[in-house]
């Protein structure tokens, strides 16, 4: 009987030791995975960006932003996603459905249709914002993926220099 108790105790301790060893290995793997492939955080268009935004000066600019799309009367995109840089600024990414042709006209068959583009906004309030479309001499006009657009179309890369000051209508 004594031998059976010792064997049972020894078996229990071995199982317990294996449990702790396996548990430690799993925790280490999860920690490494969490820090290695940190995903970009794209969100749906927030409610305070949705609406029609206008500038009325020498010319009228109008931008319409919905949960899924962005248009300025010339180019249009859907699958809209936002990457916030803070509470008042960020980037709106769209997949072109209407883009510029080589002759500066806009159409649904332009080469960039289906590709990704970005617009930067800053100083967002409930009724105003500053908006700039991505442009850089000798820069890209669109990218194949949203991740490429996020890496390419940035303030630091020189794509956003002129901002329109807009009011919500």
Predicted segments — roles?
Residues 2-11:
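Bacterial N-terminal signal peptides that target proteins for export
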Residues 10-20:
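Sec-dependent N-terminal signal peptides
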Residues 149-159:
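Short, exposed beta-strand-loop hairpins at the edges of beta-sheets
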Residues 56-62, 75-150:
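Contiguous, well-ordered beta-strand patches that form the walls/edges
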Residues 45-61:
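Tryptophan-anchored aromatic micro-motifs
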Residues 3, 18-48, 169:
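Bacterial Sec-dependent N-terminal signal peptides
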Residues 160-169:
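Short, low-complexity, Pro/Ser/Thr/Gly-rich segments in the mature regions of secreted, periplasmic
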Residues 62-68:
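Intrinsic low-complexity, repeat-rich intrinsically disordered segments enriched
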């Amino acid at each position: 009987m004594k031998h059976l108790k010792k064997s049972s105790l020894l078996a229990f301790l071995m199982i317990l030791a294996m449990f702790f060893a396996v548990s430690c290995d799993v925790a280490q793997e999860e920690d490494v995975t969490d820090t290695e492939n940190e995903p970009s955080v794209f969100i749906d268009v927030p409610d305070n960006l949705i609406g029609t935004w206008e500038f009325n000066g020498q010319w009228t600019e109008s931008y319409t932003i919905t949960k899924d799309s962005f248009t300025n009367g010339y180019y249009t995109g859907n699958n809209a996603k936002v990457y916030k840089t803070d509470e008042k600024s960020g980037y709106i990414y769209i997949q072109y459905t209407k883009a510029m042709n080589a002759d500066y006209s806009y159409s649904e068959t332009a080469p960039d249709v289906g590709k990704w583009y970005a617009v930067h906004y800053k100083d967002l309030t409930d009724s105003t914002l500053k908006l700039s479309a991505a442009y850089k001499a000798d820069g890209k006009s669109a990218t194949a993926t949203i991740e490429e657009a996020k890496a390419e179309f940035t303030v630091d890369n020189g794509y956003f220099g002129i901002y329109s000051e807009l009011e919500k209508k």
